[in-house]
Design a protein with these regions (language model features):
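Short, strongly hydrophobic transmembrane alpha-helices
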Residues: 12-41, 50
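The feature marks short, hydrophobic/small-residue-biased sequence motifs that occur predominantly
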Residues: 113-151
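Solvent-exposed, non-transmembrane alpha-helical starts
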Residues: 67-82, 128-132, 162-166, 179, ...
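Short, solvent-exposed hinge/capping segments at secondary-structure junctions
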Residues: 139-153, 165, 169-186
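A short amphipathic helical element positioned immediately N-terminal to and/or at the very start
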Residues: 1-10, 87
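Membrane-proximal extracellular/periplasmic loop immediately following the first transmembrane helix
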Residues: 36-122
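"Rare, low-scoring activations can occur
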Residues: 172-173, 196-284
Length: 284
């Protein structure tokens, strides 16, 4: 029986070779097409890691020197910062807003910009590539974004901590890569800047989150902005706000936008647009 089967296969070897080639070709094409789709679908199904349902982002801009109302004295870095904080306070005091925080820089969750570096655990020589996001201390940054608590300090405590220049906050996956534990508080990282060795104490840990909606959570560190030159930050000033529970996003945006255009001005700064974070994610 076996000899008969082998004889038949050999007699039809040319046809069988073509069938095998077709099967291989179909398998390759299917893998090329379906594998990225499956991976992307899986990545999109992973939770963002922060609460976007009640978030809005206000983008700021600045008057040009020839524009009516331009104030040359308001171009000082300290005056720009004062105006920025005044606008943030106005947003925070608007009816229906639970909290608001300045978002300064081009790298923030689901932004189109990114910043990267490499760090090492103290006593180790293995580099870990990480994304960098910056924040201004004492501005309710972590709890406004709705990051999940990690081991140690709560998001509110991390927002209100008295940071020094080299302190950092990291995500849980960063801590696990570097220290093989999610509890990285009071540990240190190090990096080199030229001939200098920079040690960075880990102040706390937040839950993993997706830097973009179609990616997996990557290692991220947060750096506090201690000394800020606002004259170089005109294109990167935003205000993140979180609505109170049960406030309609659609109704809020309908009422907030005309008020924003009329009232949200300070120095040479003004609000250019506002959108829900869900809309930002959809666009990006």
């Amino acid at each position: 029986m076996l000899k008969l089967i082998l004889k038949n296969l050999w007699a039809r070897r040319r046809r069988n070779v073509w069938l095998l080639a077709e099967l291989i070709l179909v398998s390759i094409v299917t893998w090329i097409i379906l594998d990225p789709v499956i991976v992307t679908t899986y990545d999109r199904s992973i939770p963002l890691g922060y609460d976007t349902d009640r978030l809005c982002l206000v983008t700021l801009s600045t008057l040009q020197s020839q524009a009516p109302g331009y104030d040359e004295e308001a171009e000082d870095s300290a005056m720009i910062m004062k105006s920025y904080f005044n606008l943030t306070r106005l947003v925070k005091d608007y009816p229906g807003v639970e909290s608001a925080t300045p978002v300064l820089g081009f790298a923030y969750p689901n932004s189109t910009g990114n910043a990267n570096t490499s760090i090492r655990a103290e006593g180790d020589t293995l580099d870990l590539p990480v994304m960098i996001m910056e924040f201004i201390p004492h501005t309710n940054f972590f709890e406004t974004y709705g990051f999940r608590s990690g081991r140690g300090r709560t998001p509110a405590e991390l927002s209100d901590y008295d940071y020094t220049e080299n302190d950092i906050v990291m995500t849980e996956n960063t801590a696990e890569h570097l220290f093989h534990t999610k509890n990285a508080g009071n540990k240190r990282c190090w990096s080199r800047e030229g001939n200098d060795t920079i040690y960075s104490p880990v102040i706390g840990v937040v839950g993993n989150f997706k830097a973009t909606s179609d990616s997996r959570p990557a290692p991220v560190i947060f750096r506090p902005l201690i000394s800020i030159d606002m004259e170089d930050a005109y294109d990167d000033m935003r205000i993140l706000l979180r609505l109170k529970e049960n406030v309609s996003m659609k109704r809020f945006l309908h009422d907030f936008q005309p008020w924003m255009v009329k009232e949200l001005r300070a120095g040479n700064l003004f609000a250019r647009n506002v959108r829900s974070y869900e809309a930002l994610i959809t666009k990006n």
